[in-house]
Regions:
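Charged DNA-binding/catalytic regions of mobile-element recombinases
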Residues: 1-177
């Protein structure tokens, strides 16, 4: 789990919080706020982990928002917090990679107008990330295990399906009559 900041068109800073499962690179929870606090983080963790699941560890940095209250909540839910070293983002490389991909693939192209707009952009990007974006570490699969559809016939043509407002595309087959 981690935070990253996003400036709006009015230069207001918004904070995006996310929890990522390392195995399939799946975003378990994501939300946006203007003023992150430890109480807000605990609420987000309640939403990310509503019940005991297959997860054992949570990797987090030394951000002041991940204080005693957050650590206590994690331990109470059966999750073991693992803090990274000071100024060592490579120790949470999967989360940092997701932040970089999110910035390169959507946030560097679209300026968020406000908190609701950023929340929608992030929600749409997470959907794209789970269903369409392939990952080398997953052997060119998606976190949701995308089905590969073979060409149905020799007359089928490739069609482009825009994603994220046309910034990215997914391709499929269409039968020609």
């Amino acid at each position: 789990m981690d935070f990253f900041t996003v400036p709006t068109v009015t230069f207001q800073l918004l904070y995006c919080f996310f929890v990522i499962a390392h195995g399939r690179r799946k975003i378990l929870h994501c939300n946006v706020t203007r003023h992150p606090t430890a109480e807000w983080v605990v609420q987000q963790l309640r939403e990310a982990f509503p019940e005991a699941g297959p997860y054992r560890y949570v990797i987090l940095d030394r951000d002041s928002k991940f204080d005693h209250e957050v650590i206590t909540f994690l331990k109470a839910t059966g999750l073991q917090p693992k803090r990274t070293s000071v100024r060592a983002p490579w120790q949470n490389g999967i989360a940092e990679r997701w932040v970089g991909s999110c910035r390169r693939e959507i946030l560097n192209h679209v300026i968020a107008l406000n908190e609701q707009h950023l929340r929608r952009l992030i929600r749409d990007y997470v959907k794209y990330h789970h269903e369409d974006r392939t990952h080398d570490s997953l052997k060119k699969d998606t976190p949701n295990k995308r089905a590969v559809v073979p060409r149905p016939s020799a007359s089928a043509t490739v069609i482009s399906m825009p994603r994220l407002g046309g910034l990215h595309h997914r391709y499929g087959w269409r039968e020609v009559a």
